[in-house]
């Protein structure tokens, strides 16, 4: 059967409806909470002269917060399903990169090595000395740089569908070429058309789910915000410094990720001394598309050294 990627007929709606409805229902709850989920506060913070949109879910006192670093071009709403799948007592901090979502575009480009000060300033303004940090895709590079530059601020590190930067095993050239523009974030039909090829995993079977995840709530700013984020990682690599990563690290990688081949996770696992590797069935977007499955692995890792009440010993 051939599926028209620019529209969804009755068969496709029936097949994808339950998954989309479940995920998108949670996406629309950003900031409101639910019967089991604490409400989140959305605010604009000025950090180092940059206006940054931030969402904070308050958790139980004494529990370390989880700071989420997004991938390229996506706003903080994309991972609402993952946040909702976590223990509601866990504080969670999300933010939009400059020029993405609700954060205004910067006037001039920036580089990844300058961004640890942004994360440190964010934690300072929210009153946290230390955080668990999760980075996915591009955000995994930011999480690595933060842990290398400010190891005192990172308690535990989770790297999802990511790589060590320039010195990585790349995906297929056609896939990387499609990543050079923000079109998939602006054109729903195109997003469905390329979802399987780009993201693999569940997106191959249900490109409509991937399309709706990308377009449910994302508020993409000027195109230069995407391009600034894209070029910020040029020339950057963590590879020779990975043995110096101090925090305990969980590496999550999909066995069908066209953007970041799983071999990169195996290389990182070999180089990061205190690391655990978990290879899951799926692709690049499973943290949002199938959050319950991966949330359990993340929570078990983050809670490994906490006391019974969830606080640090």
Can you say where each PLM-predicted feature lies in the sequence?
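Conserved HGGG/HGGXW glycine-rich cap/lid loop of the alpha/beta-hydrolase fold
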Residues: 50-102
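Active-site loop/oxyanion-hole signature of alpha/beta-hydrolase fold enzymes
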Residues: 94-134
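Conserved alpha/beta-hydrolase catalytic His-Asp/Glu region
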Residues: 168, 188-241
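Catalytic histidine-centered segment of alpha/beta-hydrolase-like enzymes
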Residues: 282-295
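Conserved alpha/beta-hydrolase "acid-adjacent" motif
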Residues: 258-264
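Short beta-strand/loop motif that positions the catalytic acidic residue
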Residues: 245, 251-253, 257
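Alpha/beta-hydrolase fold catalytic core
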Residues: 1-66, 89-90, 303-313
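Flexible "cap/lid" loop of the alpha/beta hydrolase fold
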Residues: 144, 148, 155-184
